Amino acid sequence: VPAAPRTAHSDPTSDTGAGRGAPPAAPAVAPDDAARPPVVVDVRTTVQEYLDRSDWRVAANANQGWSLGGLVLSAAGKVVANWWLSQVYPPEVERAHREGDLHVHDLDVLGGYCAGWSLRALLEQGFGGVPGRVASRPPRHLTSALGQMVNFLGTLQNEWAGAQAFSSFDTLLAPFVRRDGLSPDAVRQAVQEFVHDLNVPSRWGTQTPFTNLTLDWTCPDDLRDAVPLVGGEPCPFTYGDLQAEMDLLNRAFLEVMTEGDADGRAFTFPIPTYNVTEGFDWTSPNADRLFAMTARYGLPYFQNFLGSDLRPGDVRSMCCRLRLDLRELLRRGNGLFGSAEQTGSVGVVTINCARLGYLHAGDEGALLAALDRLVDLAATSLELKRSVVQGLVDEGFYPYTRRWLGSLENHFSTIGVNGLHEMVRNLSGDDEGLTTPEGHAVALRVLDHLRARLVGLQEATGHLYNLEATPAEGATYRFAKEDRRRFPGIRQAGTDARPYYTNSSQLPVGFTDDPFEALGRQEELQGRYTGGTVLHLYLGEAVSSPEACRELVRRALTRFRVPYLTVTPTFSICPTHGYLAGEQPTCPRCADERGPGAGPVVCEVWTRVMGYHRPVSSFNVGKQGEHAERVPFREPEGLASEAGPAGSAPTGSAPTGSAPAGPAPAGPAPAGPAPADPARAGLAAAGAR
C-alpha cells in the first residue's frame, strides 16, 4: 500500500494548530544561536475557534468544559505545545507527532504526567516545606487531615498533567477516628466534605483535579505493627488495631459516593481503587455497600491481587524495588490512573498501530521494523522530557514536587498502543482482527516485541519504561481523523463523521454482549501491559442487585487473570428526578407527570469515558461515535442466585488463566494454566468471529 505524501503541516486540526515548513536538522535541544525557525500561532484563530467551538479539541477532554479557564488553558497550551515540538524535540519527533505516526501526550503542559504520593508522610509532617508559602503542622483531627489532603492534591495537580494518587486512604486515616472517638455521623460528615471539595473545578482550565484513592479494606501486613503519629505524637496503638475505624471510614466513603451530589450525579473523583486479595471479605456490611454502589454507578476500580506475588503494602516499598533489575519490566502499580507511592510516569507516547497495519499490509516483519523506528522516536522524546522536567524540578519551577518528591528516578517513561484491532484488520486485508485466533496472535506478538524493546531501553538509558494501554481519549480520534484525510482506504471504526480506533488491544465495542467471553478473550492481552490497563464491563443499565454485582466481580476476578476491572452501567440524570437507570435521553417520569402536550425534559446520560465518569454530551467526536456503536454487556443470568444469601459468597481464590509469554511482570494477575471453567462456555461456543 503506497504511503501518502509527507507534507509541511499547516493543518489547523493537527495537535498544536500551528503551521510552518519542515524544520531543518537541529540539536535535540536547540541553543539560542541555532534555534529552529519560530512557530507562528494565529491569535485570531486560536481564540475564535475556541469561542465558536469549531475546533474539536475544545471537547477533547471530557473533564474540561467550555469556559474562560478553558480558553486560557487552550491558548497557553498551544504555545507550550509548539515550544516542546519546535524547541525541545528533534525534527523527526515533531514530524511524527504532527503527522499522526505517534502522539506525544500532554504537550500543552510543561510538567510530568502522573504521580503517587505518600499519604503517611503528609499526615506525619503536615503540608508545607515550601519557602514563602503557607505551612501546616501535622494534622491532629480527621477534618484537618482531609483538608490537608485536598490542598495537597489540588496544589500538586497544578504541577502535573495527569492523575494524582494516594494509597491506603482507610488505613492511614483510621488513627484520627480512634484518637477523637468519632461517631459514624461525624466520620460521614468529614468524608462528605472531602469528596465535595475534590470535585470543585479548581484546577487550571476549570477542571476538577484528577485524583485517585486506593483503599486497603483490611490493614496491610507492612503497617500492621507500625505505630501511627497523630499531630506529630505517637499513638498508644498500631495500625493493625484499627479495623473498626477502617470500617467506619469505608462505610462513610461508600455512603457518600453512592448518594452522589445534590442532583443525584455521581462524583467523578476521586476514582476509588479497591484491592481484592485472598482474604477479601465479600460478605461484610461494607461489601454490601460497595457492590450496591458499583451496581448503581460503577465507580470503583478493582485491583486483582488474587494469585499475585505482590501485596497491597508493596506500594510503599515499590520505589525501592524499581531499581533492582533493569532487565525486568515492572508494574507501576495501582491501575490506569493510580501510581504507587513516590512513583508515576514522566510522560506518555502512544503509537498509531492502525496506520502501521495499513502501510505494511501483508508484511508483519516490515510492520515490526517500522514500529521499532517509532519506539526509538518515542524514547527520544521521553528521555528529553525527563531531562527538561528534572532540570526544572531542581531549579524550583515545581516547588511542591521538589519538596515532596525531589527526583524522577523512580518515575516511568510510558509507551502505549492504540488501534491494535484496526492494525490487524489493515495488515490482513480485513481477513483477521482481534476477534480471530490469528489476529489475536499477531497482537500478542506485537506486544511481546514492545516489551522486549522496553527492556532494551531500560538497559540503555538506566531509566524505567512501561507498556500501557493508554486511554487515548483524544488521541484515538486524532489518529483516525488524520488517517482518514491521508489514507482514504484505511479501515477504521465509526463513521465518516465520527471515526475512531478501538482503544489499545480491546475488542471492538460491538463484538459481544457476553462479559465472560470478553474476559476470556482479553485476559492474555491484558497481562502484557506493565503500565495502566483495565477491562471495563460496560452495561446498559444498573446491575439488578448488589448480590448480582458482587457475583459478577467475584467470578471475573477469581476465574480470569485480568489485572484491573470495572463494572460500568449507563445511567441518566433528570434535573427534576435525579438518578435514572439506563440511557434516558429524556425523562419518562417527567413525560408521565407533565402530559402529552408538554415538551420533553432532557436528561444527562452518564457513562465512563476511558476511565472516569462524565456526561456523554461532553465526549469528543470520536468518543461519541464509539458510544453510539457500543453493544453493552448483558447481565449474565442467575448471578444473584449463584451468589446465595448474604454471608455465603465464596472468598477470593487464585484465578485460572492463560500464561503470557516473555518476561513475566511483577504485579497483579500473573499467568497460569487455564483449566476448563463454566464461565468460559460462551467463549468456546462463539468460536472465531
PLM regions and their residue ranges:
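N-terminal alpha-helical targeting/anchoring segments
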Residues: 1-3, 8, 18
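Long, intrinsically disordered low-complexity tandem-repeat segments
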Residues: 646-684
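Charged, amphipathic alpha-helical regulatory modules used
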Residues: 2-5, 407, 628-629
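Conserved catalytic cores of very large enzyme subunits
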Residues: 29-409, 430, 436-599, 605
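Conserved phosphate/anionic-ligand binding catalytic regions in large, soluble enzymes, centered on
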Residues: 160, 407-424, 599-618
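Intrinsic, low-complexity terminal and presequence regions
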Residues: 572-647, 680-689
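Intrinsic-disorder-associated, low-complexity terminal segments enriched in Asp/Asn/His/Tyr and depleted
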Residues: 9-11, 15, 677
